[in-house]
Amino acid sequence: MATIKEVKEQLAILRDLDDPRWASFEEDSRTGVQAAIRKRRKAILAELAEEERLETLLNYEKSLYARGIELIAGVDEVGRGPLAGPVVAAAVILPKLCKIKGLNDSKKIPKSKHEAIYNQVMKEAVAVGIGIKDNYVIDDVNIYEATKLAMIEAIEKLNPQPEHLLIDAMNLDLPIEQTSIIKGDANSLSIAAASIVAKVTRDKMMADYEQEFPGYAFAKNAGYGTKEHLSGIDKFGVTPIHRRSFEPIKSIIKK
């Protein structure tokens, strides 16, 4: 009789809930085997659900593939709302029908998985472009315009250049066919890829800023107006990376 460890190894091979081999395992009444069966079935169901989710996230891309368009760039930004730091945009072209497990709107991905999924996107992508506009540009032209400039910069860095843009809730003044998608990072795999690239890039920048400007917890809050961040402003004042057109920074520097 196979050991429970050996049974687990054999179960790991199964990918289909209708596989006839399940029957032989189910005849084994050992508690450990029955627990392993339940665990493997649950894992397969999760894998099937993930596959279905990724297929749904490719709906926009598949409609473009059907028209013969293959160089599709997803475009997204991170950092519109913080009181400090830049706005960062990313543009990502993935291979046709590419699926990256766990890829989603970066806000829905556990922080512990950000780096691994970012690395997978960077490995799989046909091209990646990143655009960064600092707080001085944001204060000069406003955050909406700075976001568009960052997106355009990211797209212009792509090589090859895309045939079509899928953009998260934005229209850009570029001679490239584009589709603006509300909540695009949750509805397009290409935009989700751009979302995680922008997120990880900006988080790394804010972690570096924490070393330069300790006391504001930038690595933890990414420049958002948390209690700890506001306490840092009260204690140490406004830094060179704070957005002076944003409240409460705007009022503080007027005092």
Curated annotation (Swiss-Prot):
Record has Repeat as a keyword: no
Q: Where in the cell is it found?
A: Cytoplasm
Would the keyword Cytoplasm be found if you checked this record's keyword annotation?
A: yes
Which PROSITE patterns does this UniProt record tie to the protein? RNASE_H_2 (PS51975)
Name the Gene3D superfamilies on file: Ribonuclease H-like superfamily/Ribonuclease H
EC assignment: 3.1.26.4
Which biological process annotations from GO are given for this protein?
Answer: DNA replication, removal of RNA primer; mismatch repair
Catalytic reactions on record? Endonucleolytic cleavage to 5'-phosphomonoester
Which note does the record give on the cofactor? Answer: Manganese or magnesium. Binds 1 divalent metal ion per monomer in the absence of substrate. May bind a second metal ion after substrate binding.
Positions with a binding annotation for a divalent metal cation? 76-77, 168
Q: Which keywords belong to this entry?
A: Cytoplasm, Endonuclease, Hydrolase, Manganese, Metal-binding, Nuclease
**Alphabetical list of SUPFAM superfamilies matching this protein:** Ribonuclease H-like
An annotated GO cellular component of this protein is: cytoplasm
Q: Which stretches make up the RNase H type-2 domain?
A: 70-255
Instruction: Give any GO molecular function from the UniProt entry.
Output: RNA binding
> Which cofactor names does the annotation list?
Mn(2+); Mg(2+)
Enzyme class of the recorded protein, top EC level = hydrolase
Instruction: State its role.
Output: Endonuclease that specifically degrades the RNA of RNA-DNA hybrids.
The text of the family note is: Belongs to the RNase HII family.
Q: What is this protein's record name?
A: Ribonuclease HII
Organism expressing this protein natively: Streptococcus thermophilus (strain ATCC BAA-491 / LMD-9)
Q: Which gene encodes it?
A: rnhB
